[in-house]
Amino acid sequence: MSANENNLIWIDLEMTGLDPERDRIIEIATLVTDANLNILAEGPTIAVHQSDEQLALMDDWNVRTHTASGLVERVKASTMGDREAELATLEFLKQWVPAGKSPICGNSIGQDRRFLFKYMPELEVYFHYRYLDVSTLKELARRWKPEILDGFTKQGTHQAMDDIRESVAELAYYREHFIKL
């Protein structure tokens, strides 16, 4: 294993909601692929401790989803806060990609980046300023070739590592069926 500036960092966060001014990160996971989307390594999947008061602010969808997945209980049991989760993630990433080289990769990744900026700023600046957002291709396919969308189905577990693996697989699907190389 050696840091390679062409490797891609994929990330997913689960949050208590969508507003970084009010809501918090409750799970973070990362993985690294090479430029051809082969998974090289999976980083730690970390439940980030939040107070009962913070968890009580979740809307019905988040309560239902994160309770069903077991995430709420893992968050309550976790001893890692934002900073500890950020440092553990950075420790993993530094082995695979130099700072400032990989765009932030994932699905609707701008939302995750807003939370990183607020709660994990050292991790946020580790990424290049560019985005590799799989949802962009999904939106283009919906408009230009909608039949392609039927060929890829996501499980939608809303568990961070599962979601990242699906994002990588979804981009590989679009590369094969939508992007002309």
From Swiss-Prot:
Residues at the active site: Y129
Record localization: Cytoplasm
A GO term from the CC aspect: cytoplasm
Transmembrane segments: none
A single GO BP: DNA metabolic process
Keyword Oxidoreductase: no
UniProt-listed CDD domains: Orn
Top-level EC class: hydrolase
Broad class of the protein's primary localization: cytoplasm
Record keywords: Cytoplasm, Exonuclease, Hydrolase, Nuclease
Coiled-coil ranges per UniProt: none
A Pfam family hit: RNase_T
EC number: 3.1.15.-
GO molecular function, one term: 3'-5'-RNA exonuclease activity
Exonuclease domain sequence ranges: 8-171
Summary of the function given for this chain in its UniProt record: 3'-to-5' exoribonuclease specific for small oligoribonucleotides.
UniProt-listed NCBIfam families: PRK05359.1
HAMAP family per the UniProt record, alphabetical: Oligoribonuclease
Family label: Belongs to the oligoribonuclease family.
Name of the molecule in the record: Oligoribonuclease
Gene from which this protein is expressed: orn
